[in-house]
Amino acid sequence: MSDEQTFDQTDPLIGLLVDERYRVTRRLARGGMATVYIAQDERLDRPVALKVMHPHLADSADFVARFRREARSAARIVHPGVVSVFDQGVVTGQGFLVMELIDGTNLRQLLRAQGAFTIPQALRYTTDTLEALRAAHRVGVIHRDIKPENILVPTDGPAKVADFGLARAVSEGSTSATGNMLGTVAYIAPEIAQTAKADARSDLYSDGIMLYEMLTGAVPWADE
């Protein structure tokens, strides 16, 4: 029996009907702030991705507010290169998001599988990401955590930017002013490391680091 199967059998959310609508079927992935499940939207009869915040973060009012803002921020972006957010709510005291389910992989997994990309391949994913970011920036949303794990690669169509959980709306008051730095060190602009403040240029910097990694197989420098 695989670890994934064991996890599914012991996870209390598996089989649960969330919000009287979303039937959780299995775990898809686990990240730093949430676990993503595959669920069936029984109202619209379609599979969706259900992102549930980790229990140890549920008591943090700041994090809960940030998590809820993810849905509002991402919902303002309508673009084929951005993972759509459909719904949000709370289950067993944990915030959740209902998102578009992408059939495919991500850039991190592709890099691990094949190493450095060809120039056309790297430019394609870079262009897809830039187009999605342009749509987000037009509505005042920055991502703050652009990295290969957050670039999904469907079996067809353009790459899609995922996980706006660390996003901040430029037009809204930003909690980054408190000095809490959000992001992955290898990909963040030096200005963020120094001030914890970001703007659209920060996303472009991160995309440039990804392009370097796709062409060479490594980031310019390790996390420090």
Describe each PLM feature range.
Residues 125-126:
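Activation segment signature within eukaryotic-like protein kinase domains
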Residues 92-106, 110:
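Conserved short submotifs of the Hanks-type protein kinase catalytic core
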Residues 54-76:
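AlphaC helix of the eukaryotic protein kinase fold
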Residues 129-141:
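Protein kinase catalytic-loop region centered on the HRD/HxD motif
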Residues 88:
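Activation-segment/catalytic-loop signature of the eukaryotic protein kinase fold
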